[in-house]
Amino acid sequence: MWLEGSPLAVLAAVSFLLSVLAAAQGSGEYCHGWLDAQAVWRDGFQCPERFDGDDSTICCGKCELRYCCSSAEARLDQGVCNNDRQQGAPDHNRPDKDSPDSTAVPIYVPFLIVGSVFVAFIIVGSLVAICCCRCLRPKQEPQQSRAPGSNRLMETIPMISSASTSRGSSSRQSSTAASSSSSANSGARPPPTRSQTNCCLPEGAMNNVYVNMPTNFSVLNCQQATQLVQHQGQYLHPQFVGYAVPHDSVPMTPVPQFIDGLQGGYRQMQSPYPHSNPEQMMYPAVTV
């Protein structure tokens, strides 16, 4: 944490030094008031004065004559001077130097205090922000890790709803198809076409082998089918050899009405499945 906050601390320290230097350059030393050689009181002033350069921030000269300059060698030590004590205060209406009210405060001191407080506020705020970021970062990582799972869950919900919608539409389509097929079955059916599975088999062999032929007989070659018929025909029971397979279409019988059509408010119901002829003979299948 301190390594991450070190650039901010360095930046704050540099800004503090620049503010101090700017305050020092803008307001130099304060030359206290003094009595000149003619015993005339001279008021104190802040360096630099109006007619001095920006670099004249040092109080120079002698105790009897003070001025602002930029040379550190010519600096005046005002602590050793004793002519800055005002004499004849009632005449000039000026307090004495030793009195509490005569303490001269440099002008740059308030600016220095304000600048130091501002820089300290920046440093403290930066440290608090770094600590908060370090403390809250582990709590945000699990939330980000859980975010893809929630996104996948949100993605699956529309898929489920679309699947249920498609199932509902398919069920409606199937019911519509069933109703249309039932209405179509009410009419007469055309006779079914004869399958061409017996493409190259004689009729006598087909009549004898019809009861024990597999369902996928059509995929066999004609020569192989003939051999299979001749081979299986030897094992047929003599009791079922004379039976023939009916190839004619099954006659349709009229469907009885389940609800009387004379009653008001009801439609005539028709059975979707045709009734089989009870007189049709059923031949049992024989497997060897």
Swiss-Prot record:
Keywords: Developmental protein, Endoplasmic reticulum, Membrane, Signal, Transmembrane, Transmembrane helix. One of its GO terms (biological process) is negative regulation of Wnt signaling pathway. Interacts with fzd8 and fgfr1. InterPro entries: Shisa (IPR026910), Shisa_N (IPR053891). Residues 132-288 are cytoplasmic. Residues 161-188 have a biased composition (Low complexity). Belongs to the shisa family. This is Protein shisa-2. The keyword Endoplasmic reticulum applies. It holds the Pfam family Shisa_N. It is a single-pass type I membrane protein. Residues 161-198 are annotated as: Disordered. The lineage of its organism: Eukaryota, Metazoa, Chordata, Craniata, Vertebrata. 'Shisa' was named after a sculpture form, common to southern Japan, with a large head similar to the Egyptian sphinx. The chain crosses the membrane at residues 111-131. Residues 1-23 form the signal peptide. Residues 24-110 are extracellular. The gene is shisa2. It is found in: Endoplasmic reticulum membrane. GO terms for cellular component: endoplasmic reticulum; endoplasmic reticulum membrane. Plays an essential role in the maturation of presomitic mesoderm cells by individual attenuation of both fgf and wnt signaling. Inhibits both wnt and fgf signaling through the regulation of protein maturation and cell surface transportation of their receptors within the endoplasmic reticulum.
